[in-house]
From Swiss-Prot:
Keyword Transmembrane helix appears in the UniProt entry: no
GO MF terms, alphabetically ordered: protein-disulfide reductase activity
Organism: Mycoplasmoides gallisepticum (strain R(low / passage 15 / clone 2))
Pfam families: Thioredoxin
Keyword field: Disulfide bond, Electron transport, Redox-active center, Transport
Disulfide bonds: 29-32
Taxonomy, superkingdom: Bacteria
Record-linked PROSITE patterns: THIOREDOXIN_1, THIOREDOXIN_2
Protein name: Thioredoxin
């Protein structure tokens, strides 16, 4: 699982991958700790998507650009543009459904 730390890195990823899902999290966040393993498990099943994580405490510039106010927040990008944004914990079956 790739961890993105700066805007240039995320921009590059979005320009070279058609489908990207980004998990914005923090190490101290309880719901983030529950979502983390689910996110990684679903990433193993959904090979047509690129899964990455952004630690909001390490990547303020990215968090500000995408207006991350609560965590976890998961953003789905298609063709370099935001297609969906979910705030809060996402159950595994719902996350899989969002990636269809």
């Amino acid at each position: 699982m790739k961890h993105i730390t700066n805007k240039a890195e995320l921009d590059q990823l979005l320009s070279t991958n058609k489908k990207v899902v980004v998990d914005f999290y923090a190490n101290w966040c309880g719901p983030c700790k529950i979502l983390g393993p689910i996110f990684e498990e679903v990433a193993q099943d959904k090979k047509d998507w690129t899964f990455v994580k952004v630690d909001v405490d390490q990547a303020n510039e990215i968090s500000s650009e995408y207006e991350i106010r609560s965590i976890p927040t998961v953003i789905f990008f298609q063709d370099g543009k935001m297609a969906d944004k979910r705030i809060g914990f996402i159950p595994k079956n719902e996350l899989k459904e969002l990636l269809k």
